[in-house]
């Protein structure tokens, strides 16, 4: 009835004569599914369904950011560092915070993937007049020059990722703990 219909009831799955349907099998086409993120990414581990968390920049890169963020157990890991943008993953332990900070020339975007927290922001270090609770899937936009802090108020690690424009940390940054992050920001003494 229809050209190249592969279903045993040819009228069940009609296919037009001009379609390239040589790959159809019971209504499934490989063109509808993109599995290249697994096969094409040599750092993807099929057996554990994990990704190697390291800095992939500045090369083109695609990642399941939710999976990578939830997988991360370090205080901070740079996932991608480019010329004008950086993506870092963070895991904030219960009762800890990212630390009160200010990036004079860097806008920042933070997305909470898992956990509960409190974000505080303000124009001065001693005057944080913006306060908002955050949960899973909340996004925080921090303008350059704004003092800010994110505090984990939940009973599990607060998993988030942060986007800096321009980059804030050196390529390949990995801070296992908040203490190591603070020590590296202070520099050698």
Where are the model-predicted features located?
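Short acidic-glycine-tyrosine-enriched beta hairpin
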Residues: 124-144
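A short, N-terminal "cap"/entry segment at the start of jelly-roll beta-barrel domains
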Residues: 1-84, 132, 178-189
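Glycine- and acidic-residue-biased ligand/ion/polar-headgroup-sensing regions
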Residues: 105-124
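Double-stranded beta-helix
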Residues: 151-189
């Amino acid at each position: 009835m229809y050209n190249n219909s592969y279903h045993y009831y040819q009228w069940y799955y009609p296919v037009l004569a001009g379609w390239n349907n040589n790959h159809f099998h019971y209504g499934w086409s490989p063109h509808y599914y993109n599995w290249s993120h697994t096969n094409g990414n040599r750092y993807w581990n099929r057996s554990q369904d994990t990704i190697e968390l390291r800095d992939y920049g500045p090369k083109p890169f695609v990642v399941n950011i939710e999976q990578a963020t939830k997988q991360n157990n370090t205080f901070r890991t740079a996932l991608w560092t480019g010329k004008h943008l950086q993506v870092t993953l963070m895991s904030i332990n219960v009762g800890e915070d990212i630390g009160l900070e200010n990036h004079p020339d860097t806008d920042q975007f933070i997305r909470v993937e898992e956990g509960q927290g409190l974000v505080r922001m303000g124009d001065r270090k001693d005057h944080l007049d913006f306060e908002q609770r955050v949960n899973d899937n909340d996004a925080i936009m921090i303008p350059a020059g704004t003092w800010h802090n994110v505090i984990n108020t939940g009973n599990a690690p607060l998993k988030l990722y942060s986007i800096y424009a321009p980059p804030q940390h050196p390529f390949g940054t990995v801070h296992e703990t908040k203490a190591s992050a603070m020590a590296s920001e202070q520099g050698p003494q």
